[in-house]
């Protein structure tokens, strides 16, 4: 999905990647 235009911190990126893998 499209991510909002915000500054994501490493923790946010890691969380997103994990969510994508779960999907």
UniProtKB/Swiss-Prot annotation:
<keyword id="KW-0443">Lipid metabolism</keyword>
<comment type="pathway">
    <text>Phospholipid metabolism.</text>
</comment>
<dbReference type="GO" id="GO:0031640">
    <property type="term" value="P:killing of cells of another organism"/>
</dbReference>
<keyword id="KW-0378">Hydrolase</keyword>
<keyword id="KW-0204">Cytolysis</keyword>
<protein>
    <recommendedName>
        <fullName>Phospholipase A1 verutoxin-1</fullName>
        <ecNumber>3.1.1.32</ecNumber>
        <ecNumber>3.1.1.5</ecNumber>
    </recommendedName>
</protein>
<keyword id="KW-0442">Lipid degradation</keyword>
<keyword id="KW-0020">Allergen</keyword>
<keyword id="KW-0354">Hemolysis</keyword>
<dbReference type="GO" id="GO:0008970">
    <property type="term" value="F:phospholipase A1 activity"/>
</dbReference>
<comment type="similarity">
    <text>Belongs to the AB hydrolase superfamily. Lipase family.</text>
</comment>
<keyword id="KW-1015">Disulfide bond</keyword>
<keyword id="KW-0964">Secreted</keyword>
<dbReference type="GO" id="GO:0005576">
    <property type="term" value="C:extracellular region"/>
</dbReference>
<dbReference type="GO" id="GO:0016042">
    <property type="term" value="P:lipid catabolic process"/>
</dbReference>
<comment type="function">
    <text>Catalyzes the hydrolysis of glycerophospholipids such as phosphatidylcholine (1,2-diacyl-sn-glycero-3-phosphocholine) and has a moderate activity to hydrolyze lysoglycerophospholipids such as lysophosphatidylcholine (1-acyl-sn-glycero-3-phosphocholine), but is unable to hydrolyze sphingomyelin. Liberates the fatty acid from the sn-1 position of 1,2-diacyl-sn-glycero-3-phosphocholine mainly, indicating phospholipase activity of the A1 type. In addition to acting as an allergen, it possesses a moderate hemolytic activity on red blood cells of mice (3% of hemolysis at 3.0 ug/ml).</text>
</comment>
<dbReference type="GO" id="GO:0004622">
    <property type="term" value="F:lysophospholipase activity"/>
</dbReference>
């Amino acid at each position: 999905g499209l991510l909002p235009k915000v500054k994501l911190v490493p923790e946010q990126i890691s969380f997103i990647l994990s969510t994508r893998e779960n999907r």
